[in-house]
């Protein structure tokens, strides 16, 4: 699919503060998309190649950039390049890297102060209660919309996709891009994730269509690795059911077998990631506690729904308009049965991986413990602005995660309670590592009982994602050939193959198996008639049939036709068959 993006270079987009921050999306900076001229010449393919995802927009400030950030981080916190041949480009709507302190000088608990210095994408939009992140998880969720057809229209400066107008590119990942999308029906901005199906399969090394969607447990309870297509459908099936203030919402999925992309529409969490790593301006302890409490409630909800996120990191924690965190990017998440997930594959961001997932001897490990480790690394990043284990070489990074002792920098000076919590979360032994219920009661988290977290019953409402829902997470319209075939069968009142010859066969209802079909006979021939009698009834005329015997036959795919004269005197009248009833073997 061709789309229109800003003509301004990526490196220049972070400079002017008022171009996008206060004036909304600059349409003057856009130019007509040259690729739109070729939309009419696109060939139609029945196979799917791309995906698009759309999320609900919270009008306000900032941009949700992490929806497309599925790139891993280096040990120093920088993102690893996906492809050396591709230039490092990231379309940002905000000017430069902004820490959360720069966004919220008034303290973490004040949502109004958090919005004072935020970057405004759409200042002219009115506040929409439907997009408010303050909605309770107990409230009935608006169901995710599944569109069976995608209509793409090329406009002068943008692309119209059903009711969505695609605007600037606000993020970029390894499998697609994230675009700002405006919904004409509800006057709301969303984040539309556009995924290329061909690129998903090509980068994963699949030469042809992968196995059916969904993750199936292997013997022993561990989860088998999934291909990228299966991961996308798993993410869709999971997100369709989740409804929590600290989890990003999936609004709509657009998919057409004749299109090359899948479109996922998410809510636009407008202030973007909680922080950039590394940063020279980490969060204060009060700010870190405020966001970490949100993270605990979100992870508890996911584990309650039997979901392991597997990629918790600051760039996947988005700040909403009320200043609270929403967990995003479920691309590598796993479902489990029972009390915990038993995992065997290694996915996620290298600097946030647990040591047991990197072990050469341990084959199966706990999924909940992986999320707790990543939460500990994230909390470390909150207060120190960097990861606890860093190295430019991936193998050295793995070695440090597995064997190097945890150390705390001298500055900034943090409380002993916080050091104790981080140390217990980054315990290299998953069996002795602290668990989420214990984290909720830790003195640093609750400020020694002054700020208790809600109970599990108050925070969680169980939803179930069945295997059938994973298989049917995105429904597709039937192809034109299938529609024509069904209409032909209805018109002929027959549900046999309408393109095969109308060869009639009689069936014996009492015969089993292959004996159900009896050899057809000509209606005008007796069942038992001497050969001499049949020869006497042979009409006069040239016998030009090379097939042997009278009548017509199919030899090597073509009919063998005889010239028929008048019946012989005294012979019974002959009723020729209307069509070939039986293919006779050639002599």
UniProtKB/Swiss-Prot annotation:
SUPFAM superfamilies: Protein kinase-like (PK-like). GO terms for biological process: CAMKK-AMPK signaling cascade; protein autophosphorylation; protein phosphorylation. The modification N-acetylserine is found at residue 2. Residues 569-579 have a biased composition (Pro residues). It catalyses: L-seryl-[protein] + ATP = O-phospho-L-seryl-[protein] + ADP + H(+); L-threonyl-[protein] + ATP = O-phospho-L-threonyl-[protein] + ADP + H(+). Pfam families: Pkinase. The modification Phosphoserine is found at residues 99, 113, 128, 132, 136, 494, 510, 571. Residues 474-499 are annotated as: Calmodulin-binding. PROSITE patterns: PROTEIN_KINASE_ATP, PROTEIN_KINASE_DOM, PROTEIN_KINASE_ST. The active site is at residue 311. Residues 471-476 are annotated as: Autoinhibitory domain. SMART domains: S_TKc. It is found in: Nucleus; Cytoplasm; Cell projection, Neuron projection. Keywords: Acetylation, ATP-binding, Calmodulin-binding, Cell projection, Cytoplasm, Kinase, Nucleotide-binding, Nucleus, Phosphoprotein, Serine/threonine-protein kinase, Transferase. Residues 203-225 are annotated as: RP domain. Residues 164-445 form the Protein kinase domain. Phosphorylated by PKA. Each isoform may show a different pattern of phosphorylation. Autophosphorylated. Residues 1-32, 74-115, 204-224, 496-587 are annotated as: Disordered. GO terms for molecular function: ATP binding; calcium ion binding; calcium/calmodulin-dependent protein kinase activity; calmodulin binding; protein kinase activator activity; protein kinase activity; protein serine kinase activity; protein serine/threonine kinase activity. GO terms for cellular component: cytosol; neuron projection; nucleoplasm. Mainly expressed in brain, but detected in all tissues tested (at protein level). In the brain, isoform 1 may be predominant. with high levels in the cerebellum and hippocampus, although isoform 3 is detectable. Isoform 3 is also expressed in lung. Belongs to the protein kinase superfamily. Ser/Thr protein kinase family. Calcium/calmodulin-dependent protein kinase belonging to a proposed calcium-triggered signaling cascade involved in a number of cellular processes. Phosphorylates CAMK1 and CAMK4. Phosphorylates CAMK1D. Seems to be involved in hippocampal activation of CREB1. Efficiently phosphorylates 5'-AMP-activated protein kinase (AMPK) trimer, including that consisting of PRKAA1, PRKAB1 and PRKAG1. This phosphorylation is stimulated in response to Ca(2+) signals. May play a role in neurite growth. Isoform 2 may promote neurite elongation, while isoform 1 may promoter neurite branching. The autoinhibitory domain overlaps with the calmodulin binding region and may be involved in intrasteric autoinhibition. The RP domain (arginine/proline-rich) is involved in the recognition of CAMKI and CAMK4 as substrates. Interacts with calmodulin. This is Calcium/calmodulin-dependent protein kinase kinase 2.
